[in-house]
Amino acid sequence: ITIIDKDGNGGQPFGVAGVKVICNVFVKYSYAYTDRDGYYSMSKKFSSKPRYRLRFKNKEGFNIGFNKVLVSASTSALGKGPSEGMDVTITSSSERKLWCRSVVNNAAYDYIKRCGKEDMDIKVPPKNLRIWIFQNMDSSSAVMMRHGAFIDGSLIAKFLGDYASLVKLFLPDITLGFKGKTAYSTLYSETCHELAHASHFAQVGKKYWDKYIEF
């Protein structure tokens, strides 16, 4: 599973890293996580063409999308493919949700991988981080509600508008407003900016964050 940033890597495909690949034929089901370069290998064999999909639940401990009861993260269908495996290359011309989710996935994967002492040496964001993408908003935030931050209802309404009640019900940690934004570098950098706030939250804790978020 690869992606192309036309302005980076010489325009050549590179992996969608750590994402969950699911395939099934009727009730037969298997899944695997991609490696850094986008390769994956299913533990089960299929005799006919299975349906493939990406579920944006990353092996590095973050999920993209709503935390529903039965589905833990957003899912993008890839269609039927060969039983021996399906190759997919995602570009900015692909279905927009798939493109945005894949860029955010890579940004979060890279950020978390680089938090160690041998690289950036900063606090890793909390595990089970919940990231939401809003296509009709242009601002982003690190509300950290799934991890216990208490945000005043009026502040949520002011910032998130019509989405406020949804946010209070499903409790995201990071919200990304991607209205009018498409470039890989733009989506990537905005995601990393909010992840830096999540690292700050992991460092200072909930009580500080409840006050800090107002600013």
Task: Name each region found by the language model.
Residues 59-87:
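Structured interaction patches on ligand/partner-binding surfaces of diverse proteins
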Residues 3-27:
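Short, ordered, surface-exposed loop/turn motifs in non-cytosolic proteins
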Residues 1-7, 38, 111:
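A short, amphipathic beta-strand motif
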Residues 23-39:
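Short, acidic Ser/Thr/Gly-rich low-complexity loop/linker segments typical of extracellular
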Residues 15, 41-51:
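Short Pro-Gly-centered beta-turn/loop motif in secreted/extracellular proteins
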Residues 202-215:
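Post-HEXXH active-site segment of zinc metalloproteases
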Residues 43-45, 59-62, 89-132, 141-147:
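Zn2+-dependent metallopeptidase catalytic core
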Residues 142-205:
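Active-site scaffold of zinc-dependent metalloenzymes
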